């Protein structure tokens, strides 16, 4: 069985409150894009489940990969036999794109289907939430408004069909803990539902990522990418999550693959 975990972008991100437990309450809109990893599970004669990695190099012990944590959740709960897992990484990490969370969520869904587990969609959501606040989003893969610590989801009317999207990630990565330590919570002046209901051409200056000011000050090359995307005709551009990737929406076809040497560049079409 093979499936293709996709990335997401944050169309906006507001830090609205600091919580007593040290976390932050946020408001953000998750939007799925078609930048994808490849994930395969197959039977094995081995005594233990193994994860094989290819593509973008991921540092650290594969046993600590979120995919393996997802596997252990279900294998322990249902006493499952070992499998072999193959993960080809194409989604950059440390980019605010949710690649690791997507891999884990897809693995949960694949294991449920492969072994025909008696697991409802709601139960699968709970298993995903135990792995990461944004993991359940990838089980639904449609635009959602996220609140709380990013784990409370509400449907939102939004369509970006036919827009072109360009994603640029510089070589620098922004640690999430560092990004949060630099921001001050601020309540948005306009409800997000009102803002995203406006034409995309009106989003600039209205949809805000609260991480940008402090992250751009510390990593000016990220801010320069956003400015350049606007100069190249973007209708809307923003950093995704806590960075370091920047995405831009265009109302026409563009080819910017050679415009950002040393950066990861991906171009696609918005499908929802």
Annotate the PLM regions:
Residues 32, 129-130, 136-139, 156-161, ...:
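Solvent-exposed alpha-helices and their adjacent loops that cap or buttress functional pockets
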Residues 49, 140-141, 145-236, 251-261, ...:
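Conserved, helical-rich catalytic subdomain that frames metal- and/or nucleotide-binding sites
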Residues 46-60, 107, 129, 199-208:
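Short, basic/glycine-rich phosphate-binding loops at helix/coil junctions
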Residues 1-95, 113, 117-122, 157-160, ...:
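ATP-binding N-lobe of GHMP and related small-molecule kinases
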Residues 86-115, 133, 235-247:
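Glycine/serine-rich anion-binding loops at beta->alpha junctions
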Residues 104, 108-145:
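Contiguous, small/hydrophobic- and glycine-enriched helical/loop subdomains that border
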